[in-house]
Amino acid sequence: VEIKKGLFVRRLRLNLFEFNYQGDYVTVDLNLMPHEKYESPYPLGFQNISRDYFAVIHSGEGNGWDINRPCMSSIIVFQGDIYLIDAGPNILHSLNALGIGVNELEGVFQTHAHDDHFAGLTTLMRADHKIKYIATPLIRATVINKLAALASIKEENFRNYFEVRDLKLGAWNDIDNLEVKPIFSPHPTETTIYLFRTVDQIGSRSYAHFADISSFNVLRNMITDDDSEPGISQEYFDDVKSKYLTKVDLKKLDVGGGYVHGAALDFKDDPSEKLF
């Protein structure tokens, strides 16, 4: 297969590839030897985080093709406990840079099963305790199905590694006194975005983690009045738009653009206190 301008690649066997450019051949073996690990493509400086009553740590803003930044993710600190929002590639590298050990993690909130939000689950499986796996049943089902296929394990074995905590879609759920609301978000695979809220010594605090989302323009072009045609209704579009523009104290947005990510201009009139 030609990649670009005379550079060809072919797959020889599992994780073994041969590149050809003007008669020069290079073989690349991506298989790992025992105890060998893939290196992270980006360096991260070390940070000292505080274990606050309620805090949000920005731990990534890239996508699955980004060689310079960790994938879109956040870390919630609540009452001193550590919760991840998604577990992407090189999650251990990110945690080490923040001074967080895998064995310190209380739970992980899952948005969806795309690799850049999912690939780090195998790292969490090796913790010395069952980390709480927090998601709606629909998201959990897609993740378990994919993980079982990739890791060659039975689907029922998922509960051997994680403590499953199901969330009710579109409702406020109590997770160890932290209120969490998963909201369905249009995306190529089943996806929920999250609202978090609590009350601390200052007052009510809220955080919105919106990854992954779709742009209003893409959704608008899908509107149809014909129920027999693929697409969405005007009512559905209005509902999604209203939820995307929910007012919170801090909102972290996926604005990667294109057909499957959000657009920054959609939030130019967002009523939230701070957008990231």
Where do the protein language model's features map onto the residues?
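Active-site environment of divalent metal-dependent phosphoester hydrolases
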Residues: 113-119, 141-142, 171, 188-190, ...
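Short amphipathic alpha-helical segments
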Residues: 96-97, 121-123, 147-148, 221-222, ...
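Active-site neighborhood of divalent metal-dependent phosphoester bond hydrolases
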Residues: 139-166
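Core dinuclear metal-dependent hydrolase active-site scaffold
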Residues: 1-100, 166-247
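Binuclear metal-ion centers of metallo-dependent hydrolases, dominated by the metallo-beta-lactamase
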Residues: 170, 259-276
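Structural motif
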Residues: 136, 210-211, 253-257
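Active-site metal-binding motif and surrounding structural segment of the metallo-beta-lactamase
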Residues: 89-138, 241-252
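Short, hinge-like loop/turn segments at secondary-structure boundaries
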Residues: 102, 150-154, 226-227
